[in-house]
Amino acid sequence: MKYRKFIILVLSILIILPVSTLDGHHIANADDDSPKKLKYKENSALALNYHRVRKANFLNNFIYFFSSSKEIKNYSVSQSQFESQIKWLKSHDAKFLTLKEFLYYKKKGKFPKRSVWINFDDMDETIYENAYPILKKYKIPATGFIITGHVGEENFHNLDMISKKELKEMYKTGLWEFETHTHDLHNLSKNNKSKLMKASEATIIKDLNKSEKYLTKNFKKSQKTIAYPYGLMNDDKLPVIKKAGLKYGFSLEEKAVTPNSNDYYIPRILISDDAFEHLIKRWDGFHEKDET
């Protein structure tokens, strides 16, 4: 009887997941989800973006392999996959940068070879439970883009968000920096448009000022950056972003970062297991020989 209930539960999840938007990130994806090889340019860096890091248990693995949900396939990796990716990067002499270092080298016009910046959007509990211990173990710096108005909230678009206490614990390690993912504009309107993209100038500035105040109060000075919800921004809204005092904006795009990358459209590569295998491992920056 218990087995039958379990099967019914799993089947129900598989039916629901493909139509659930969770946090709606899938709208930023192109129709063609197959990863291409990254174009390599000298003097470039990789900004690797993560959203969910799943526990590798039977139920999660079952759902992953049998679900058609883009949220699960494209916006999550398992804990074991995440650790394997970190170990691969270390074995290929990646130079892990903090956000502060990443922005410094970009502004200076010269990235160290094999520069990698690890970052996370939303900051739900899976990051604290499954990614944070691995990064701490290997002493890898990372940046978390927080939806500051929903810290500690349960069931925010089907996600349990990290608490302030947990964020402060992470911050005290010296490995984490936290930036804004808006205060309360990470949402979709009724017609599936980003709330940030539809909001008025006054609403956006008020929201981003609230977020900046939260970050400054709890984590000292921020770097004045934003990860756009769903990775989306356009030129019409950029003057408002600048007026709010933000100096850099991050999108989601399968490109390496160069010093010439637009400061308000800095590309980050959304990491899934497939993306890491096809894009990151094949990036020529990890295979070029050092000058002797």
From Swiss-Prot:
UniProt keyword annotations, A-Z: Cell wall, Hydrolase, Secreted, Signal
Chain ranges passing through the membrane: none
Additional observations: In strain COL, the gene icaC is interrupted by a natural frameshift.
Name the record gives this protein: Poly-beta-1,6-N-acetyl-D-glucosamine N-deacetylase
Family matches, as NCBIfam families: PIA_icaB
GO CC, any one term: extracellular region
InterPro entries: Glyco_hydro/deAcase_b/a-brl, NODB_dom, PNAG_deacetylase, Polysacch_Deacetylase
PANTHER family: POLY-BETA-1,6-N-ACETYL-D-GLUCOSAMINE N-DEACETYLASE, PTHR34216
Pfam families xrefs: Polysacc_deac_1
Molecular function, one GO term: hydrolase activity, acting on carbon-nitrogen (but not peptide) bonds, in linear amides
Function: Catalyzes the N-deacetylation of poly-beta-1,6-N-acetyl-D-glucosamine (PNAG, also referred to as PIA), a biofilm adhesin polysaccharide. N-deacetylation is crucial for attachment of the polysaccharide to the bacterial cell surface; it leads to the introduction of positive charges in the otherwise neutral PIA polymer, allowing electrostatic interactions.
Family: Belongs to the polysaccharide deacetylase family.
Keyword Signal applies: yes
Species assigned in the record: Staphylococcus aureus (strain COL)
Ranges where the NodB homology domain occurs: 114-292
Compartment(s) where it occurs, according to its Swiss-Prot or TrEMBL record: Secreted, Cell wall
GO biological process: carbohydrate metabolic process
Signal peptide location: 1-28
Record EC number: 3.5.1.-
Keyword Secreted: yes
Main location: secreted
